[in-house]
Swiss-Prot record:
It is found in: Cell membrane. This is Putative dimethyl sulfoxide reductase chain YnfE. [4Fe-4S] cluster binds at C56, C60, C64, C96. Its main location: membrane. Pfam families: Molybdop_Fe4S4 (PF04879), Molybdopterin (PF00384), Molydop_binding (PF01568). GO terms for biological process: anaerobic respiration.
Length: 808
């Protein structure tokens, strides 16, 4: 057998094992590995005391299983899932470099070990150790005072995604134990949206009534895959295996893959058939140019549009819409703007050549089924709501919705085993704000209104935010926009009067705490974690404490139970219901078993560590029931159909207060934005800047692990053409700046990014002298981003920025 013949049959297990050993050799600087690796592993096996199942439950969503080897109450090394035969559709849930480095997080010398109170100014990071009693008494006293003086609407649970997978440990504010505690004590100000998906989650329901997409594995049945800003090789690189499933599904279908992105991503990386670099924020213009070709060359699915859609042309336009207010008129230039959306028009905006737009339109119009999807980068723009709905128009125009191998234009859906979560109870406070608007609510809350600021539940806020819970999240500073402005707001103690931070490390956000509490990590306590982004295989992971509690670190449930005691016996009883954390897990799992008898018992799951189950329906096809019978299975839109023209959006556009450069439209149109590709500000700040998810971090989690920082340097990507103009060579230290702030970091000069565009991995820890020059040496992109929200969702537009870059 030849060498080539042997390589054809290489397994995923062998490949990963061999590359892992090779990586170790490289990390050791060329040090030769011994050939007694197997014997050494056996020796370690004999010496260890136990292996404990854990999970990495940070907000990449992959939620990978970990097998932690423990000796003398210390984690000595980490491996990942090794169960099953590891085949397509039933693969091992393997961790990436982040999860595999969790030992370095657990044993990190900078772990928080004791309760502390602030003794300097907020943001200085000056604290002194206090007892748990003092910390808990202070929190309870401040909470009582806030509620008595301002009411429960003045209490806010900060957006957090540091622990998204946990049940008892989950940090998502709408589903956390903190939310349950506050609902036992009169409630707190609600929030809507997310930093990840605010615009698409808001916009897509106006079209479809929901935000569903076909599963990745359904690409087995596709002839063409078109990905707008979707980069699972970095955003969903492990665990559930979206990247792996994408490649295996394409092997089966031989589908052509076209990647549309300003950056040549790892999802492309030689696997794509074509990369089309596009200016950030112009995806809707590309869609319009494609639509012009589809319409003029009779490539639209007219029967589908007539039967299932509202507002494509005059035939299905709602009665309350203006004449020529339909989508076809907009594309052909017969609408209000009198501009035909030709490929030439689209090319001038997007930077994609006219002939390539025409070719792409014909490919989309003739390849059926076509899987057209979008990641969450395109929607994280100031015009992101319009972009999300616009991309959905391509499968709508071509009739690819509701069929196997097609898609809705949304991101891929996944099969998940539904778990019974800790009930948070009802919130007596019905007012809510966008999760991105909390700094406004601190600074000028009573001035925030429903029609200008997106306040829901009442016409305006009555009080500003005075008390903040910040549990397992870095959005207080690092992941929020315009850090310098946010610093000014938080440092003013007359505004927000109490900030409680519950954390593992002294993060950028923790420095602003008044009371700082040391939390256990998820792997240090008992919990059950379900999969999230995992194709058509769901799983549950049972976490057991990897070590005993160390120093004075405590689990979140204990912390909140102790606060509840201090708020009154009725609050304590309502919060705990007389149960410990373990008893809650057993109680909730019993409810799961009652609904899903196929699950293993609690003790069996605990012994197994991980339980896997394939989707019994095979591939998930979004809106299939609607496609099969639209009358029996209407969508959750007012018409029950796909609403290309939304009367609800027309009413919002008519009644809301908007800035002159903001657009809310009943149609999925293209609109330019502030700090966009054609902004006058480009004369001063000529480069567009966006952030991307970096493989060494999940947002900011793992951002303090030295090994990962060394392996994946924080850099600003810049095209060679732009670099040459500025005298910048690869690796040069540069300053990236605009009117909001300045960041200093190395330059990555690469043709993998479009000229006129720059990019930085988001989530790097902010490092600046906030009482001095405020220059960020950590490379945090949010030093440069804006607090101005998007028009409809009031979401974060952290990819809409203009900067200049100069060599230092």
């Amino acid at each position: 057998m030849s060498k080539n013949e042997r390589m054809v049959g290489i397994s995923r297990r062998t490949l990963v094992k061999s590359t892992a050993i090779g990586s170790l050799a490289l990390a050791a600087g060329g040090f030769s590995l011994p050939f007694t690796l197997r014997n050494a592993a056996a020796a370690v096996q004999q010496a260890r005391e136990k292996v404990v199942w854990g999970a990495c439950s940070v907000n990449c969503g992959s939620r990978c299983a970990l097998r932690l080897h423990v000796k003398d109450n210390e984690v000595t090394w980490v491996e990942t899932d090794n169960t099953g035969s590891d085949e397509y559709g039933n693969h091992q849930v393997r961790a990436c470099l982040r999860g595999r480095s969790i030992r370095r997080r657990i044993n990190h010398p900078d772990r928080l070990n004791y309760p502390m109170k602030r003794v300097g100014k907020r943001g200085e990071g000056k604290f002194e150790r206090i007892s748990w009693d003092e910390a808990l008494d202070t929190i309870a006293s401040s909470l009582k005072k806030t509620v008595e003086q301002y009411g429960n609407e003045a209490v806010y649970i900060q957006y957090s995604s540091g622990i998204v997978g946990g049940n008892m440990t989950r940090s998502s504010p709408s589903a956390s134990a903190v939310k349950r505690l506050m609902n036992c004590y009169g409630g707190s100000l609600n929030q809507y949206g997310s930093y990840s998906t605010a615009q698409i989650s808001c916009a897509m329901p106006y079209t479809y009534g929901s935000n569903d997409g076909n599963s990745t594995t359904d690409i087995e049945n596709s002839k063409l895959v078109v990905m707008f800003g979707n980069n699972p090789a970095e955003t969903r690189m492990s665990g559930g295996g979206i990247t792996y499933l994408l490649e295996k599904a394409r092997e089966k279908s031989n589908a052509k893959m076209i990647v549309i992105d300003p950056r040549y991503t790892d999802t492309a990386a030689g696997r794509e058939d074509e990369w089309l670099p596009i200016r950030p924020g112009t995806d809707a213009a590309l869609v319009a140019g494609i639509a012009w070709v589809l319409i003029n060359e009779n490539l639209v699915d007219q029967p589908f549009l007539d039967k299932y859609c509202v507002g494509y042309d005059e035939k299905t336009l709602p009665a309350d819409a203006p004449k020529n207010g339909h989508y076809k008129a907009y594309i052909l230039g017969e609408g209000d703007d009198k501009t035909a959306k030709t490929p030439q028009w689209a090319s001038q905006i997007t930077g994609i050549p006219e002939d390539r737009i025409i070719k792409l339109a014909r490919e989309i119009g003739t390849a059926k089924p076509a899987y057209i999807c979008q990641g969450w980068g395109p929607q994280r723009q100031a015009n992101g709501e319009l972009t999300a709905r616009a991309i959905a128009m391509l499968p709508i125009l071509t009739g690819n919705v509701g069929i196997s191998g097609g898609n809705s234009g949304a991101r891929e859906s996944t099969y998940t085993i539904t778990i019974e979560r800790l009930p948070v109870l009802d919130n007596p406070v019905k007012t809510s704000i966008s999760c991105f608007s909390w700094t406004d609510a601190i600074d000028h809350g009573p001035q925030m209104t429903a029609i200008r600021d997106g306040v829901r539940g009442k016409d305006k806020l009555d009080v500003p935010i005075k008390f903040i819970w910040n549990y397992a999240g870095n959005t207080l500073v690092n992941q929020h926009s315009d850090i310098n402005k946010t610093h000014e707001i938080l440092q003013d103690e007359s505004k927000c009067e109490m900030i409680v931070v519950i954390e593992n490390f002294m993060t950028s956000s923790a420095k602003y705490a008044d009371i700082l509490l040391p939390d256990l990590m998820t792997v240090e306590q008992e919990d059950i974690i379900p999969n999230d982004y995992a194709g058509n295989m769901g799983y549950l992971i049972f976490l057991q404490p990897v070590t005993s509690e160390k120093f004075e670190r405590k689990p979140i449930y204990w912390i909140l139970s102790e606060v509840a005691k201090r708020l009154g016996p009725d609050v304590y009883q309502k919060f705990t219901e007389g149960r410990t954390q373990e008893q809650w897990l057993q109680h909730l799992y019993a409810k799961m078993l009652a609904k899903d008898p196929a699950l293993p018992s609690y003790d069996e799951l605990k012994k197994m560590g991980i339980y896997k189950r394939k989707d019994p329906n095979g591939h998930f096809v979004a809106y299939k029931a609607f496609r099969d019978d639209p009358e029996a299975n209407p969508l959750k839109t007012p018409s029950g159909k796909i609403e290309i023209y939304s009367s609800r959006l027309a009413e919002i556009a008519r009644t809301w207060e908007l800035e002159k450069d903001e657009v809310i439209s009943p149609l999925p149109v293209y609109a330019s934005t502030f700090e966009g590709w054609n902004s006058p500000e480009r004369r001063t700040f000529p480069l567009q800047l966006f952030g991307f998810h970096y493989k060494s971090r999940t947002h900011s989690t793992y951002g303090n692990i030295d090994l990962l920082k060394a392996a994946c340097r924080q850099e600003v990507w810049i095209n060679p053409i732009d670099a040459q103009k500025r005298g910048i060579a690869n690796g040069d230290m540069v300053r990236v700046f605009n009117h909001r702030g300045e960041v200093r970091l190395p330059a990555k000069v690469t043709p993998r990014i479009l000229p006129g565009v720059s990019a930085m991995g988001q989530g790097a820890w902010h490092e600046a002298n906030m009482s001095g020059d405020k220059i960020d040496h950590g490379g945090c992109v949010n030093t440069l981003t804006t607090l101005r929200p998007s028009p409809l969702a009031k979401g974060n537009p952290q990819h809409t920025n203009l900067v200049e870059i100069e060599k230092i």
